[in-house]
């Protein structure tokens, strides 16, 4: 399952996430403690287009290891996510 998840996330590695959206997603997730792939964007954005864009951005941040999840379980819209504290140093460089 782990390798399936890594392969799934590869397509998001090069996705661009704007600095403002990235900070908004990470700050909100930090405040919440944890959320899911679908819930985080729905919590922030109110219109469907931005929620869908936000879901794509969350996957991109998971692929870039800024957001963490259990990669040994199947990745779904309900996957529990949290801010990757181990990668916080790299974000601040």
Segments the model singles out, each with a brief description of its role:
Residues 1-93:
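Electrostatic, structured charged patches in enzyme active sites and in nucleic-acid/phosphate-binding
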């Amino acid at each position: 399952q782990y390798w399936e998840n890594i392969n799934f996330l590869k397509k998001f590695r090069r996705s661009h996430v704007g600095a403002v959206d990235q900070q908004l997603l990470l700050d909100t997730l930090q405040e919440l403690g944890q959320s899911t792939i679908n819930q985080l964007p729905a919590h922030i954005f109110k219109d469907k287009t931005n929620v869908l864009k936000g879901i794509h951005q969350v996957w991109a941040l998971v692929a870039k290891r800024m957001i963490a999840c259990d990669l040994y379980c199947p990745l779904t819209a309900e996957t529990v996510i949290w801010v990757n504290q181990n990668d916080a140093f790299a974000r601040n460089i």
